[in-house]
Amino acid sequence: MITKSSGDGVHWPSLIGALHEYAVVGRRVKVLSSALSSLIPPQARVLDVGCGDGKLDRFILRQRPDASIEGIDVLVRPKAQIPVRRFDGVTIPYPDSSFDAAMFIDVLHHTPDPLAILREARRVARVILIKDHFRNGFFAESTLRLMDWVSNARHGVALPYNYFSQSQWSDAFAELRLNVREIKTTLRLYPPPASWLFDRSLHFVARLEASAPS
């Protein structure tokens, strides 16, 4: 919904957000559900960390009815489309090895310490699926900040703009002893001509697996 500012002008975050919702969100859900559903282990119990309303999970389950997905979030939405449990954003409220896989879909760059919550995910699941960004190339930082602001500012989501370069992600995975088993970098989340600016090499989906204890 487009709202008014306190004066007579249009509230621009709401207007731009509404246009983004119309042009991008539906496509994003379809593209990501397809990309992620192929990476989930067979008959997996999956935890979606920072699941939001669970709409993406519902689309994944249409393609993977053998799996089950439940979520955790710092804010539990009243009409979430999967079971959701509240958590503090730091400690995942489940015992070790409770899940076959954990997912972070555009969540880690909203956290102050991505490695800390990834370490928690590694504790509860051996397979970790990530959709996030690469801060690589000219204007990557400013482009990612713009996308984040358009998508999230009107919802009151924290925006620390904590983007990693590809080499920083590689270092983080190595530190946590997470092996990259598959990675997708051509996602086509945006229709042309927006894709020329907002797709590029800024997005990735990855499947990681924890190394066996030595």
Model-derived segments and spans:
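A short glycine-rich, Lys/Arg-flanked "PGG" loop and its adjoining helix->strand segment in the class I
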Residues: 115-128
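A short His-aromatic
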Residues: 106-110
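A conserved beta-strand element that flanks and buttresses the S-adenosyl-L-methionine
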Residues: 103
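Class I SAM-dependent methyltransferase SAM/SAH-binding core
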Residues: 47, 52-91
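Core SAM-dependent methyltransferase catalytic element
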Residues: 191-214
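Glycine-rich helix-loop-beta junction characteristic of Rossmann-like nucleotide cofactor-binding loops
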Residues: 35-41, 92-93
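C-terminal alpha-helical "lid/dimerization" subdomain adjacent to the S-adenosyl-L-methionine
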Residues: 58, 133-195
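Class I SAM-dependent methyltransferase Rossmann-like catalytic core
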Residues: 3-34
